[in-house]
């Protein structure tokens, strides 16, 4: 007999335990792109009676970006998943291919889908790219005006940028007094030591190998300082995929968007 299941909106901070269980259930961490969306989305408890058995997180655009159930309810996951879709008016779903529960639920419903991002979660070797005679230094507070005027492509506030600089997570390639590029790491979640890599190259200096060398620098930096790193890029960003692969990153997974 299927138990009575209900869905109840909740303040995320009131039930962080369910999210922690979800993160532990996955073989890999998700990137900062999704973590940022989670902070701006609606959190829903999934209940059996008055017992919390899982949760869903839905963006303001009605996209499901997280779905979790306790193991003892996996046998009725398709029923609960359909209930979530109907009750929360879900129009699309972001699913990481290493999230077997959500992937299976989506495939069972024969949804249309497309691959939207390539996810890099493994390193095959120490980067072979040499960075001799390639000047890289830590960003400092007095670099803020320059960075704020140049980094239009980075979705980052002044406060977020200052935080990365203070933690020594932001690095610059400046040559002949010109900012050619920068690379940085962001801690994906406060409770886990996992770092997402970001990069920016000045449009005037692109296609000159700067991005490859910046990635080599930051990957080596993370390895030397025991900072586990992950990365991802749009499926059509072939250039970035080649750079990551050249620097030893391996992609075994993707982010899929299922559409209803």
Residue map of PLM features:
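Recognition helices and adjacent regulatory flanks at domain boundaries
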Residues: 26-27, 171-177, 183-188, 205-221, ...
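Acyl-donor-binding surface of acyltransferase catalytic domains
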Residues: 59-63, 69-132, 258-260
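Conserved GNAT acetyl-CoA-binding A-motif
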Residues: 87-98, 222-234
